[in-house]
Amino acid sequence: ELRKLEEKSDLLEQVRILLQNTSEYAREQARQQIEILVTHALEYVFGLDIQFKIELKEVRGRTEADFFVKSTYGDYIVETRPQDARGGGIVDVISLALRIAMLQAFQPKIMGPLILDEPAKHVSEEYIGGVAQFLKYYCDMFSRQDIMITHNHQLSEVADKVFLIELKQGKSIVTPYTSA
């Protein structure tokens, strides 16, 4: 009887170790894929001197993630939290790329469009064109429709269709928009 309990205990311990190793492997794969996608987004918008890093750590038996932006300035490498790196535009681009990464990584796949409301409101004029091209590239790459609400003309210029919505006498009037 005791021997059977010991064997069962050993088996359960082996199963626990297997599940733990599998979980660690899956977390590492997800971390790498997300880092790559977000880094590509940052490079697309801000240039090749920037990377996105995720640091995973165990805290009270739970895995937590910290995000960092790693920038290269000549021989100097600076690693900061996104909210501390070069302003709010970085946070907007990271947020956008993380949403896309989560949509693509989730199983079963989440179908339907990517719906965005002013996705790059803190990105400066200098970089907004890069955000527009990034969105176009990734929506084309993942065959995902993008429905976006924006006041930014550069973002709307990469759209296949643009609609102007105006409030007139308490009613929303929707008309196809063509640039002049």
Residue ranges: model-predicted function:
Residues E1-L56:
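Charged, surface-exposed helical/loop "interaction arms" that form contiguous linear patches used
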Residues I54-L56, V69-Y73, L98:
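Flexible glycine-/small-residue-rich
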Residues G129-A180:
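C-terminal lobe/lid and adjacent interdomain/linker elements of RecA-like ASCE P-loop ATPase modules
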Residues I110-M111, H122-Q133:
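Conserved D-loop/post-Walker B switch-helix segment of ABC ATPase nucleotide-binding domains
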Residues R60-A65:
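A short, glycine/Asx- and small/polar-enriched loop/turn
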Residues E79-A85:
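Short pre-catalytic strand/loop immediately N-terminal to key active-site residues, enriched for Gly-Thr
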Residues S71, G88-P113:
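GG-anchored amphipathic helix commonly corresponding to the ABC/SMC/Rad50 NBD signature/C-loop
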Residues D117-P119:
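Walker B catalytic acidic pair
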